[in-house]
Amino acid sequence: MFLAENPVLQRELVVNLRMHRAFLLLFGYLLALGAVVYAAWPAATRLDMTESGAGAARELVDLFFVGQYLLASMMAPSFAAGTIAGEKERKTYESLLASPLRPSAIVLGKLLAALCHLAILIFCSLPIVMLCVPLGGVSLYEVLAAYLALTASVISFGMIGVACSSIFRRTVAALTVSYLIILPLALLGAMSWWWLRDEGQTRLLLATTFLPGGCAVLVAVLFGSTARRLMHPPDVGSEGKEVVDLDTEMKKTVGMVIKGDQFPDKLFAPAKRDDLMPDGANPVYDKEMRSELFSQGTLMLRIVIQVSMFLAIPLMGVFFYVWPDMAPWYISYVVLFNVLVGPVFSADRVTSERERETLELMLTTTVSPAQILWGKLFAGLRVSSVLTSFLVWPVPLAALMVGYYWGNLGTMLCYVIVIALACLTTAVVALFCSVVFRKTVISLMTAYLVILTLFMLPPAVNYFVDNFVVGPYVAQEVVEVEEEITFDEYGQEVLRTKPTPPRRPAVVADQAVIDRALNVQRVARVLGVASPFSAIHALPLSGSQHEIRYDASTAGRAGNWWIFVGYAIFTLVLNGVLLSIIDWLFHVRWRVAG
């Protein structure tokens, strides 16, 4: 009953693999990977199979693997975070604990069922990457080592999601904490793989020994702790709901404690009201701020704050004080944090009313749809903005303490504007998804998908176009010069220089092909107006490397103020359109009954 006849595993596999979305996910995943490989395929009619000409294939394989690694890392929590928390939401958690199944069998069944989708995706993508091996520059052993590292990482991330799912009552909270833990690890792994691209032996050793060993230890520890938690569950009330008492929780809290009557905690988590609500106040906004947030406890909120600050302190020191010209990367971290936490506090504002069957009652009251809309919006926006602002305080601090930024105060102010617009966008998009969809989980996942597409796709397209569309046509025949000491025929030392072959050979093409590639690059630049990351890295920093204009291969983005202005206009228009649609849907009673 542990594996071969595990009813939990069998039920999850039968239900999940027979859904239409499983086939659609596989089709879309392979179509996207195949399109990337096809677009990045070397355009040369003759390929140099020696070591000097192997750079194109190596870069293509690295791009394929890093992209697949990040995609799998983002999908693993979405499959695993609802395994046990979903049982609590469906009110079957108590029945599962009362079954004769051992806790370890339950955890193993949930873990394997959550990872079966990713296992199929990873296995089916192997033939695509094998197409790149005949190009040279990468061996079969490197590909297999990369897939071993990918498999070990995905299993670890899935186990983290299952562990979070056993701790929290709601899938939304488990998913948020899972992403907050997994995303830094995934970015660290992707950057390490990219930095070691010229150290094949070292990368092969790490991928086959240290990484799988570390992942095995992590999985074993989390598996044991999750099984023990199911063996000795916390206090369970009616219908399998865990009882959360705020006073008891605060007494047992280790580390950060949230007190709603003190500053700054009352900005994002005010205490419950013990007096009458003043006249003219928005009852929806007051209810959302003082009841909804603390109704599920403060554990998720405390973890989010502590993990974000733990990561922000070293990043602040490195990007603001050690390398001041790298400040855009810290701002990107702040925006990425808001991308993770912003939708959480807005994606369930309306779907939770539907799930509790209270939306009809709310719409039959004297509260107008406009009051409901703005109350829901400002409640989620207030919490996410205050949490994000905790990471913004290093910006004015660095502007005052570091002389390097005294001539860049306008750019620093624009950084804050970009962060504020990103906070608004994440809240509005999540609220729109909450109005359109019926279930909170679907609303949250759709909001994440839309926001990541808007924010991440334009920079990814720009990088791809610069390196694989325009780059081959503008690569120089000689990229660096090596010096060597030789002896002439008379025995005298002579310093000679010899050209080093480029990493990627230049492609000889006519001017029409080059012009077409440059036009594609210009279109990719225009897409940057939808992404705060493109706007951040387009802002100039005087006296830094950002002022250096790149050649035709990269078509310098730094100092392009029009990208920042375009982003501000695009964001305001997008949010205005979405809010207008939400207001119209409230007036027509969209999906109120049923």
Q: What is the role of each PLM region?
A:
Residues 1-73, 82, 121, 127-352, ...:
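Transmembrane alpha-helical segments and their membrane-interface loop/helix boundaries
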Residues 9, 83-115, 285, 293, ...:
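Helix-loop-helix units of permease transmembrane domains in multi-pass membrane transporters
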Residues 26, 42, 50, 66-80, ...:
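N-terminal cofactor/phosphate-binding cores enriched in small/glycine residues
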Residues 78, 87, 98, 109, ...:
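Mid-sequence acidic-hydrophobic segments that form the walls
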Residues 99-107, 118-126, 167:
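Hydrophobic or amphipathic alpha-helical targeting/insertion segments
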